[in-house]
A protein has these predicted regions:
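Chalcogenol-based redox active-site neighborhoods
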Residues: 1-176, 183, 190-196
């Protein structure tokens, strides 16, 4: 299992726009944009997928964290940008199944063109981007220290600490560890400059 780190997009970056189809039928929206997704206190964008062991390892915590963040005024979306021709387990029909199985209460969007992932400079699954109420990037980094095969408990402590700071209107700080996971599965010939 290859380990790919986050690119660590520059803090303060404005949330890149998106308007993508939603495959979590439990949330009701057919399409979701940045404006739709943002809460009064901010927005959490998570690049995930169905098959990556790094995502599977923390999926239950993602469900809990998504619920908790929304309760504190942070909008939450997950985006799958993987090439589904090479990785059919990540196809939209399976996204719907995964969202229901995990109890995701947030939209699960499909970035078929992979342009949104490139705009965020997303590199791995999971990859997290937390924006403040002005939709400026406050945190990009890991959920916590847990990894498949490690004994670290899955607590979401790093991302939860950042969410608490954003909700309180406080600075998150710049000491942020990159997320780590499977690389996004780019379509052949579509790999971004920052990949590899």
């Amino acid at each position: 299992m290859a380990r790919t780190p986050s690119t660590m997009l520059e803090l303060g970056t404005k949330a890149p726009a998106f308007d993508l189809p939603n495959y979590n039928t439990g949330t009701g929206e057919e399409r979701v944009s940045v404006q739709d997704a943002a809460g009064p206190r901010g927005l959490l964008v998570m690049f995930i997928c169905n098959h990556c062991p790094f995502v599977i390892h923390v999926a239950d915590e993602l469900a809990r964290l998504g619920h908790d963040a929304k309760a504190h005024g942070i909008g939450v979306v997950a985006i799958n940008a993987n090439d589904t021709h090479k990785h059919p387990a990540d196809a939209p029909v399976h996204m719907t199944e995964e969202a229901a199985k995990r109890g995701y209460t947030f939209p699960y969007l499909f970035d078929e063109t992979q342009e949104v992932a490139k705009a965020y400079k997303a590199a791995c699954t999971p990859d997290f981007y937390l924006f403040d109420a002005d939709l400026k990037l406050a945190y990009r980094g890991q959920l916590d220290d847990a990894r498949p095969g490690s004994d670290e408990p899955i607590t979401g402590k790093d991302l939860r600490r950042a969410i608490n700071a954003v909700v309180a209107g406080e600075d998150v700080g710049t000491d942020q560890k990159p997320s780590m996971g499977c690389n996004i599965k780019w379509k052949p010939g579509s790999e971004p400059d920052y990949f590899g």
